[in-house]
């Protein structure tokens, strides 16, 4: 059944992900006061501690402080700074609830990493600046060629299933979401964040740290499907990306080149397929 939840191990109601503020609001030409829940946005500094004892700043991300462990792992993987979970020896500055309450996380890496910090993008708002070409992506991860297929009715049920699990959005109205579904439409995880790319990195980190399969999975996102969303999905091995909103031209180009089925405008009992439609069963 589409939207059946099988293992929601991810807790989006973590303390610190929202704050309450007294606001004034307009009703009937007059102002009233009420409490409003606000999504938290705070910086997270990510450092890498290599085997030589040298610490390098990998980035500073503006994020909602929940599931930082997944965010850090997904970010480092998407950036090509780790090749898999085996590269990570441990986390410092991340508490048992998976959150860095000091807004500073250090990842112990068991291999030497060489990269130019100044040439890397440290802002989660853009993906292509100084980054990958299609050829570079295909070097890191071969073209997706799975024979995975999914029923149209299952695709249509994904937004509702994701929306019901978006606890932080329902509370604040101020965050994006990314979700991991299998091709039977069963929901495995929903990750929310003030940044839509962060939400995807959290899903990617979840699959890495929890050992979840992506070969027969769908990445569902609540916002538009831009280049970086498709790039992250490809590097994580997702054959299908689904969005309730529009794709960008570059996202379509990347999806077509790397073998991803890109399905957008999934709403009101309809959707558009922009690349590799052979995976969708009418």
Curated annotation (Swiss-Prot):
Pfam family membership, one: FdhD-NarQ
Claim: Protein transport is one of the keywords in the record: no
GO CC annotations on file: cytoplasm
Active site (UniProt): 126
Keywords recorded for this protein, A-Z: Cytoplasm, Molybdenum cofactor biosynthesis
Localization per Swiss-Prot or TrEMBL: Cytoplasm
UniProt cross-references to InterPro entries, sorted A to Z: Cytidine_deaminase-like, FdhD
GO process annotations (BP): Mo-molybdopterin cofactor biosynthetic process
Chief location of this protein within or outside the cell: cytoplasm
GO terms of molecular function: sulfur carrier activity; sulfurtransferase activity
Superkingdom of origin organism: Archaea
Family classification: Belongs to the FdhD family.
NCBIfam families membership: fdhD_narQ
HAMAP family assigned to the protein according to its UniProt record, in alphabetical order: FdhD (MF_00187)
Purpose: Required for formate dehydrogenase (FDH) activity. Acts as a sulfur carrier protein that transfers sulfur from IscS to the molybdenum cofactor prior to its insertion into FDH.
Name of the protein: Sulfur carrier protein FdhD
Organism: Thermoplasma acidophilum (strain ATCC 25905 / DSM 1728 / JCM 9062 / NBRC 15155 / AMRC-C165)
Phylogenetic lineage: Archaea, Methanobacteriati, Thermoplasmatota, Thermoplasmata, Thermoplasmatales
């Amino acid at each position: 059944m589409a939207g059946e939840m099988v293992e929601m191990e991810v807790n989006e109601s973590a303390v610190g992900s929202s704050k309450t503020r007294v606001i004034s609001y307009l009703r009937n030409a007059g102002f009233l006061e009420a409490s409003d829940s606000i999504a938290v946005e705070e910086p997270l500094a990510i450092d890498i501690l290599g085997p030589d004892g040298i610490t390098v700043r990998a980035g500073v991300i503006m994020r909602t402080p929940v599931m930082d462990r997944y965010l850090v792992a997904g970010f480092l993987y998407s950036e090509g700074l780790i090749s898999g979970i085996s590269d990570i020896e441990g986390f410092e500055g991340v508490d048992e609830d998976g959150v860095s309450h000091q807004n500073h996380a250090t990842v112990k890496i068991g291999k030497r990493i060489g990269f130019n910090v100044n040439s890397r993008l440290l802002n989660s708002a853009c993906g292509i600046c100084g980054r990958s070409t299609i050829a570079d992506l295909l070097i890191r991860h071969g073209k997706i060629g799975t024979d995975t297929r999914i029923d149209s009715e299952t695709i249509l049920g994904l937004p509702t299933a994701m929306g019901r699990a978006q606890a932080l959005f329902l509370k604040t109205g101020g965050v994006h979401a990314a979700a991991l579904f299998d091709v039977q439409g069963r929901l495995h995880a929903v990750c929310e964040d003030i940044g839509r790319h962060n939400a995807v990195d959290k899903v990617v980190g979840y699959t890495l740290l929890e050992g979840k399969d992506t070969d027969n999975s769908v990445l569902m996102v609540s916002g538009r499907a831009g280049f970086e969303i498709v790039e992250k999905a490809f590097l994580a091995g997702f054959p299908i990306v689904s969005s309730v909103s529009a794709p960008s031209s570059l996202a379509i180009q990347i999806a077509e080149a790397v073998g991803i089925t890109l399905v957008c405008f999934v709403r009101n009992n309809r959707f558009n397929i922009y690349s590799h439609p052979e995976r969708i069963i009418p």
